[in-house]
Amino acid sequence: MQEQYRPEEIESKVQLHWDEKRTFEVTEDESKEKYYCLSMLPYPSGRLHMGHVRNYTIGDVIARYQRMLGKNVLQPIGWDAFGLPAEGAAVKNNTAPAPWTYDNIAYMKNQLKMLGFGYDWSRELATCTPEYYRWEQKFFTELYKKGLVYKKTSAVNWCPNDQTVLANEQVIDGCCWRCDTKVERKEIPQWFIKITAYADELLNDLDKLDHWPDTVKSMQRNWIGRSEGVEITFNVNDYDNTLTVYTTRPDTFMGCTYLAVAAGHPLAQKAAENNPELAAFIDECRNTKVAEAEMATMEKKGVDTGFKAVHPLTGEEIPVWAANFVLMEYGTGAVMAVPGHDQRDYEFASKYGLNIKPVILAADGSEPDLSQQALTEKGVLFNSGEFNGLDHEAAFNAIADKLTAMGVGERKVNYRLRDWGVSRQRYWGAPIPMVTLEDGTVMPTPDDQLPVILPEDVVMDGITSPIKADPEWAKTTVNGMPALRETDTFDTFMESSWYYARYTCPEYKEGMLDSEAANYWLPVDIYIGGIEHAIMHLLYFRFFHKLMRDAGMVNSDEPAKQLLCQGMVLADAFYYVGENGERNWVSPVDAIVERDEKGRIVKAKDAAGHELVYTGMSKMSKSKNNGIDPQVMVERYGADTVRLFMMFASPADMTLEWQESGVEGANRFLKRVWKLVYEHTAKGDVAALNVDGLTEDQKALRRDVHKTIAKVTDDIGRRQTFNTAIAAIMELMNKLAKAPTDGEQDRALMQEALLAVVRMLNPFTPHICFTLWQELKGEGDIDNAPWPVADEKAMVEDSTLVVVQVNGKVRAKITVPVDATEEQVRERAGQEHLVAKYLDGVTVRKVIYVPGKLLNLVVG
């Protein structure tokens, strides 16, 4: 064994061994308990970043640990390979998205191997291959036949100059990112999947997910947004149709003083025919894309349509306004406004001088003061005719019942969740498998024409999708009739909604899933990824699982038992102000810093001498130029060091602060482990350990070894607090470094301890552990070695610490045998100098003894 730890030599050797032996390839094995450990698949952007490294290290630690417990562990990896960035990169680099993507996959695959992740590479998949997306296309046609897919018009961002649809991220300050033209909202036909048909199940089954973070579950609950309320119909004077609104607060109905409709509502459109101000307002709304998240903070605007609705219970005429806070795609596109008891309605009414009528008493029974804001709390009704004096629940039911009896109301359950629009007017995605015949009939692409293959050898002009630009591509024949293919492609969330299931049978040719393999491996035991995916991906992932279950492919209700959301990786961020006042961000690698005695940065400059402003730690990002390249760190310190730092620096679900000093610390620790094994093995063979013949000191050290095994097992397995597991191993290493190594049994004990340490570190730092296991002559490869088991007998304490008090004041702490009698403890206490001093010349009046813990001598 060489004396120095040289990761650059051992890591590539061990990785080659894993490759040649196919160590991590698995097949279904009914005789073993399975464990499916999955990290969210990466987008092949070109290089791994530290966020990836953290995500995949956590997954690998768990997978390797479960494997050492004797389970059949599946840990696959693949590539979420479709998506918009590839189109931009292709234009920039004068290539096509496909070769750019495949080059990136090859490069990043080598980076993953360099980090030593134990993946089953035989299951690798890329979502941009027809072998993968053909099954998604087939499944979509099945969903269409089941009535779960439909087409309707929906608004998109449209650039009139480029004549193209823009993704939300391509709209910068309301303008096209390419040509700076003002973006319009345009209605175009798009495909939708009925996720709303599963809303109740998606909501209720959250209760089954005991091992998902509460934050994620509550985000999904809010996103689904189930509410119970009443749908109310209003007659409108001089208008051919009625207006329908939905409210969750029918108890406030007598305080409704106006209605508001979306700018795109037919009533607003009709009113605008003779109202130029309203027409201009509708135009303005059409070209302002409003994300629902921004609704709360944006300025509320509106125009009176001139129409009057009739309040069904009071007969009063109330105005109908067009307002920018009502969205056509939500509910009925119309809302009732109760400005006395809803803050948004209050602000709008105050701005435009509309009537504000209070109908709920304040908590103390007085009339509410509405001079500054609305009273939004529930309470007792007044000003409400026959409903006066009713509390919230009674009023809710009485008014709902009355409206229902009159035929103008209906109790309804509503959802915030909208159906999933899966059409994208982009090129680099899976083609949507639908065709339109000459007579206008729309139908799914027949099975014998699947997959609809996306041509990869294309020229990108950066504006129009190549399959839209080429009229020949869309032409096909169905049942002998000419037809046109759909030229939109799927939302890339489609591919990432079922990849986890395809990993169980990536080569299967007969269908989307081989049920036997899928049901052996699924559900996923632990799924690891960022919390930013809480609603979109993780909701579609759950939805798709239920769709596949209802198609008879899987027999479980949920795709993953446990979800672990890792924290972000932060790094120092620095900038200097340029000549034009712009911020130039400087990589922390290039910052020369001065620190105070507490280690805080007080001054910084770069190599060119610019004074740098230090903005603290923030998420690693391109925009702040504070990403640290994992490859550079692996080349400098080795993969094991980077992995160890990642797992030690912070709990897995908290943010991690990247500090190179911490990386150096992890590296020093691994050098110490190497050195101890080197010194131990240099002394030659080791005798067998004789547990019964150990000295007290040897017993104490062995107790520490086995207590550490018990703690690390609990920390990794049950608690998943990996940082505390590593801390416990480090603490044990400090004790081993000081332990005597001269006697035969000292060395036998050291052998037992080091074999345990190397196995406990193996999930974190597998290359060094593989090598040290061989040097220690461990049985077989460490990859097939069992996890160490704590010896209960070794952990039994044979002595205990007793606190000695005189008149309730602590005077000594003494170590006594566990089975010592009260007399023996008193005798031992009397030998302590301080205790003897306080007992000198006084009488002990009373003795309080708590066996093995406390001795209190009361004197006087």
From Swiss-Prot:
Keyword Repressor: no
A GO cellular component entry from the record: cytosol
Catalyzed reaction equations: tRNA(Leu) + L-leucine + ATP = L-leucyl-tRNA(Leu) + AMP + diphosphate
EC id: 6.1.1.4
GO molecular function ontology, one term from the record: leucine-tRNA ligase activity
Chain ranges for the short sequence motif 'KMSKS' region as given in the UniProt record: 619-623
Presence of the UniProt keyword Nucleotide-binding in the record: yes
Taxonomy, superkingdom: Bacteria
Residues bound to ATP: 622
UniProt-listed GO biological process terms: leucyl-tRNA aminoacylation
Motif ('HIGH' region): 42-52
EC supergroup of this enzyme: ligase
One Pfam family in the UniProt entry: tRNA-synt_1
InterPro entries on file: aa-tRNA-synth_I_CS, aa-tRNA-synth_Ia, Leu-tRNA-ligase, Leu_tRNA-synth_edit, M/V/L/I-tRNA-synth_anticd-bd, Methionyl/Leucyl_tRNA_Synth, Rossmann-like_a/b/a_fold, tRNAsynth_Ia_anticodon-bd
Keywords, comma-separated and alphabetical: Aminoacyl-tRNA synthetase, ATP-binding, Cytoplasm, Ligase, Nucleotide-binding, Protein biosynthesis
Subcellular location per the Swiss-Prot or TrEMBL entry: Cytoplasm
Protein family per UniProt: Belongs to the class-I aminoacyl-tRNA synthetase family.
Name of the molecule in the record: Leucine--tRNA ligase
Source species: Shigella boydii serotype 18 (strain CDC 3083-94 / BS512)
